[in-house]
Design a protein with these regions (language model features):
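Bacterial N-terminal signal peptides
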Residues: 6-15
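Noncatalytic scaffold domains of N-terminal-nucleophile
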Residues: 20-41, 45, 53-218, 223-225, ...
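N-terminal secretory signal peptides that target proteins for export/translocation
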Residues: 1-2
C-alpha cells in the first residue's frame, strides 16, 4: 500500500455494554478494521481493486454512514491521521463548525439557565457537517481510485439494505432512541415501526442511497453546493436550525501538523487540537 492511515470519527457515547465474540482476523498486504463487517468488506474490496489505504478508509467511512452512523456519518465530522510510505505524517481536521448565526447564550433561557435538551436534541445543536468534505479532501490529495468507485458500494448498501445485528437492534429498540427518531417526520418514516427490530431484519434507507448516489456522481462538493445542500437548508428551515447556505459553501477541512512525542523509544504521532486525544496521550505518557 502506498499510504497508511488511521481514520477516526468521533462516536456518539452510548450507555450500553455489549458482549461480542471477537473472531480471529488474518490478512496479507492490508488490513481493514472497523465496527461493521459490511463496511470492512467494502474496504477489503477496494484494496483488492488496487486502492490504497486512503481509498479504503473513504469507502469504509461511507459504509459506516449506512450501517453504524454513530461511528461514521455524512452529517457529522472527524479527524484523519495519515502516515505516508515515505514516513511523512500529517493530519486533517474536518470536525463540525459552528453556524455563522450561533451566539454565546443560544442554549440559555432569559434567566441564564440551561434549556434542557436544546444543545443535544434540536437542530440548534447541529454544526456544519465536515465528514464529506474531509473524505473528499484526503481522497483528492492521496487517493488513487476514482471517487465514485469508493462511494457506490455504500449506495447499494443503503438501497438494498443490510442485516441488523445485536448492536443495531439494541439502539433502534431502546425507548430513548425510539423517542428521538420519532420526533422528526423524516427519521420517523425511516426508522420507527410498530414492532421491535430483530437480528437479521433488513434495513433499507432509500433516501440515504439517493444522497450517496449524488455524492458519488458529482463529487464531495455536491453535499455543500448541490441538491443535498438544498435538503439540509430545507430541514433547517423546517426545524428552526441555524445552518445557512453560506455556512455549507464556506466549509473547509484543515490540514494540521500532528502532535509528536516519544514513549519508551517509540515516536508517537497523534491529532492536535481541536481534538483532545493527542494532548491527553502526551500528558499521560
Amino acid at each position: 500500500m502506498k499510504n497508511l492511515i488511521n481514520y477516526f470519527i468521533i462516536p456518539t457515547i452510548l450507555s450500553f455494554a455489549f458482549a461480542f465474540e471477537i473472531p480471529d482476523a488474518i490478512g496479507y498486504n492490508g488490513v481493514v478494521v472497523c465496527s461493521k463487517k459490511e463496511a470492512a468488506q467494502i474496504g477489503i474490496d477496494i484494496l483488492k481493486k488496487g486502492g490504497n489505504a486512503i481509498d479504503a478508509s473513504v469507502g469504509v467511512a461511507f459504509a459506516l454512514a449506512v450501517t453504524h452512523p454513530s461511528a461514521g456519518n455524512i452529517g457529522g465530522g472527524g479527524f484523519a491521521m495519515i502516515r505516508l510510505a515515505n514516513g511523512d505524517v500529517t493530519s486533517f481536521d474536518f470536525r463540525e463548525t459552528a453556524p455563522s448565526l450561533a451566539y454565546e447564550n443560544m442554549f440559555l433561557d432569559s434567566l441564564n439557565n440551561v434549556i434542557p435538551g436544546k444543545s443535544k436534541y434540536t437542530s440548534w445543536a447541529a454544526g456544519v457537517p465536515g465528514s464529506v468534505h474531509g473524505l473528499g479532501t484526503i481522497h483528492k490529495k492521496f487517493g488513487s481510485l476514482p471517487w465514485d468507485v469508493l462511494v457506490y458500494p455504500s449506495v447499494n448498501l443503503a438501497r438494498f439494505g443490510f442485516e441488523l445485528d445485536l448492536h443495531n437492534i439494541i439502539i433502534l429498540n431502546s425507548e430513548r432512541y425510539k423517542k428521538l427518531l420519532a420526533n422528526d417526520i423524516v427519521s420517523k418514516k425511516i426508522f420507527t415501526k410498530d414492532v421491535d427490530y430483530k437480528i437479521g431484519d433488513l434495513l433499507i434507507q432509500k433516501d440515504l442511497s439517493l444522497t450517496l448516489e449524488r455524492i458519488a456522481k458529482y463529487g464531495y462538493k455536491e453535499f455543500y453546493e448541490g441538491k443535498t445542500s438544498d435538503y439540509i437548508i430545507e430541514c433547517m428551515n423546517r426545524t428552526g436550525g441555524l445552518i445557512s447556505r453560506n455556512d455549507l459553501r464556506n466549509y473547509k477541512s484543515v490540514e494540521r501538523e500532528p502532535i509528536t512525542f516519544s514513549y519508551r523509544g517509540y515516536t508517537i504521532h497523534s491529532m492536535p487540537p481541536p481534538s483532545s486525544g493527542g494532548i491527553t496521550l502526551a500528558s499521560i505518557l
